[in-house]
Design a protein with these regions (language model features):
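Generic structural signal for residues in well-ordered beta-strands
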Residues: 69-71, 149
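Immediate post-signal peptide segment of exported/extracytoplasmic ligand-binding proteins
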Residues: 24-40, 61-68, 167-169
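N-terminal export signals
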Residues: 3-4, 10-31
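Stable alpha-helical elements in mature extracytoplasmic
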Residues: 51, 55, 79-83, 134-137
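Extracytoplasmic "Venus flytrap"
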Residues: 37-54, 74-78
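Alpha-to-beta junction loops
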Residues: 65-67, 83-97
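Contiguous mixed-secondary-structure segments that line small-molecule binding/active-site clefts
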Residues: 2-3, 88, 98-169
Length: 169
């Protein structure tokens, strides 16, 4: 009978040590992938849509696949000019487009456009946005139009020409 008691004690001791060891080690859980659906305001073959895809690839690679961004071309879910509302309402998780597309909601959003050459060039606009109060103003404007979004500038849009005319103006 002594040997049975000894076996039971050894079993209980081993079990207690194994239990303590199990509790002592952190549980390693594989993180689940978070998937986000973005849409751009550009057709699939447009260079700016490619920029959006490049951004998504960088994020996907940096997170080791834990965050996966899918970028859809314009019109896949909503028309290009409906992108801000779709993101704001949660229909899409994010978007890639031009701020000036929302000019109809507040004319001050035209400041982020690529207007004629007598305005700020792309680098000046980026500098003003980051260091001159532009970001704070954009946040206020989006709040004023009821947009529930967080925005950041991904890159500059080159200045577009004023126009093409048959006769000098």
């Amino acid at each position: 009978m002594t040997s049975n008691a000894s076996v039971r004690r050894k079993f209980m001791t081993t079990g207690a040590v194994a239990g303590a060891a199990t509790l002592g080690f952190p549980a390693i859980v594989k993180a689940q992938t978070t998937s986000l659906r973005f849409q751009s305001t550009w057709p699939a073959k447009d260079i700016f849509h490619e920029y959006a895809n490049d951004f998504a690839k960088k994020v996907n690679d940096m997170t080791g696949g834990e965050l996966k961004i899918e970028v859809l071309p314009a019109g896949s879910v909503v028309p290009a000019f409906g992108l801000l509302d779709a993101v704001s309402k949660g229909t899409l998780d994010g978007g890639h487009g031009v701020v000036v597309y929302h000019y109809g909601k507040n004319s001050a959003l035209a400041l982020w456009g690529s207007g004629p050459a007598f305005g700020m060039d792309a680098n000046m606009l980026l500098s003003w946005h980051k260091y001159g109060g532009g970001k704070a103003l954009l946040d206020k404007l989006y709040t004023a139009v009821g947009a529930n979004v967080y925005s950041y500038v991904y890159g500059p849009m080159p200045t577009q020409p004023l126009g093409w005319f048959k006769k000098p103006i």
